[in-house]
Amino acid sequence: ELTVVGSGWERSLLERLAESLGQAGMVTFKEHLDDKDKNIELQNAHILLHTSVREGWGLNVIEANAMGTPAVVYPVDGLVDSTIHGVTGLVCEEETPDSLAVEVMNLVADPEKYHMLRQNAWGRSHEFLWEKVLPNTCNWLENLASGKI
């Protein structure tokens, strides 16, 4: 089963594609989710697929990791920073559906690796808790404002 969250200009194309492939019953499309519903979706997900070709950071990767859900991502700036290949998730070799499919199939075929990625993803997500991030960010901003950097 595949759940696609969000809206965009390709949504209707994806809905028609699922229908034409006879997979409409296996694909669920959801609009914007509030934090509670988003967390439920991420907890229930086996894998987060992130196929953006431009990304600043990949916050939803860390959010998924916090729910114990590893990500399979395209090899673009931001996503390669939020995903440690083979440790917290997988980074595709190319920005293509075929490359994504290879990574997903390899992961599905290796339950031990999947379990390890889940544990590591959850553990790494704790590095991004406000209690850890906020002091460093404040120090950096203070140094920037005072001309130290």
Where are these regions (language model features)?
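Nucleotide-activated donor-binding/catalytic signature segment of Leloir-type glycosyltransferases, i.e.
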Residues: L13-L33
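Short hydrophobic beta-strand element within catalytic cores of glycosyltransferases
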Residues: V61, P70-V73, T83
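Conserved acidic donor-binding segment of nucleotide-sugar-dependent glycosyltransferases
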Residues: H85-G86, L90-P97, N106-P111
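A short, well-ordered alpha-helix in the C-terminal region of glycosyltransferases
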Residues: S99, N106, K113-E127, N139
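C-terminal alpha-helical cap of glycosyltransferases
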Residues: W130-I149
